[in-house]
Amino acid sequence: MNIFLVGMPGCGKSTVARAVARRLPLTSVDADQVIEQRLGCSIRSYFDEHGEGAFRDVEEAVIDEVTTASPALVLATGGGAVLRPINRQRLRERGTVIYLRASPEQLAKRLRDLYDERDPLYRECAHFVIDTRGAGLSALVHRILMQLELAGPVAD
């Protein structure tokens, strides 16, 4: 039995996959972890350097391989895995797809809770705090470079 979990980022796919796999028992696989192992870097780094198209190509290949590798797994897909029709088709044909649907309010609350937990930790270790509200990439880079120039060398 293959079970494939889909849903928005933050809806709990990875956590639920591990819990379901323990109960059945099946193997739990996190597609994003498989992708990062294959790439040798974070998804964000790869995405930034190579673009969304290249990332989606890798994601498509991983989904194809993982969904045929074992007849007994629970797969947590990445939040954007369903963007390609071939991924939706393969998931539907190769197992039972479960959509973990979380409301925008639930997702926002989870993100807010995570923010509340981590913001003090980020601040504790930061030399500078740069507010990203309303700023595009070039503006953020400019702000960072200005801050570094004003501050001079920062001790390691």
What kind of region is each of these model predictions?
Residues 5:
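Hydrophobic anchor at the beta1->P-loop junction of P-loop NTPases
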Residues 8:
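P-loop (Walker A) phosphate-binding loop of NTP-binding proteins
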Residues 13:
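Conserved lysine of the Walker
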Residues 16:
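Hydrophobic positions on the alpha1 helix immediately C-terminal to the Walker A/P-loop
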Residues 19, 23, 117-156:
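NTP-dependent small-molecule kinase module
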Residues 30-92, 121:
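ATP-dependent small-molecule kinase phosphotransfer cores
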Residues 79-81, 103-105, 135:
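Short glycine-rich anion-binding loops that position phosphate/pyrophosphate groups of nucleotides
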Residues 93-120:
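A glycine- and Lys/Arg-enriched "phosphate-lid" helix/loop adjacent to the NTP-binding pocket
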